[in-house]
Regions:
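Structured mid-to-C-terminal alpha-helical surface segments
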Residues: 1-157
Length: 157
């Protein structure tokens, strides 16, 4: 579901995996901007959400996933490696991910190596072309370098 009001857009996704840990948060920060009443909602545990986002990147290689991973890392979130391992064991690759770019050894260290390699090769041009519909130009400038720095810090080789 997408909510829009003036310049603010919020997208809500609903997942039904009942076994995933969650915690309760208030929507007040967003709903105040939209003139809606706040609600208490369950949200996915951040380490699990990071693992799922990393697995999603592995399966589709979208830079918006890289941005989301970077955002979690900047917040100091540590990945749930057990969840990540379970997700990379059975990937559902997009047809857009060439076989040569798929994870060969389905282990967490091999995944980190692949992730580091892909992030190291990113350019500002690629980031801008992919994320220009989502972020203003002022935020795109130098973002590839910020990705590289944060990923290297989180997953040193």
């Amino acid at each position: 579901m997408v909510l829009k009001r003036d310049q603010t857009v919020a997208q809500v996704e609903i997942k039904v995996d009942q076994s995933v840990p969650t915690y309760i948060v208030s929507t007040k920060g967003v709903t105040d901007l939209l003139g809606l009443p706040p609600r208490l909602i369950p949200v996915l545990d951040f380490p699990v959400a990071l693992a799922d986002k990393m697995a999603a990147w592995n399966e589709r290689r979208l830079l918006r996933d890289v941005y989301d991973i970077w955002f979690f890392l900047c917040m100091g979130v540590k990945v749930d490696e057990k969840r990540l391992l379970s997700r990379i064991q059975k990937p559902a690759y997009s047809r857009l991910v060439d076989v040569s770019r798929q994870l060969e050894e389905r282990t967490v260290p091999a995944f980190y190596d692949l992730l580091r390699k892909e992030i190291t090769e990113l350019t500002d041009k690629e980031v801008s072309e992919s994320l220009s519909d989502l972020l203003p130009e002022v935020e795109l400038t130098g973002l590839a370098m910020r990705f590289k720095a944060e990923f290297q810090k989180a997953f040193p080789g």
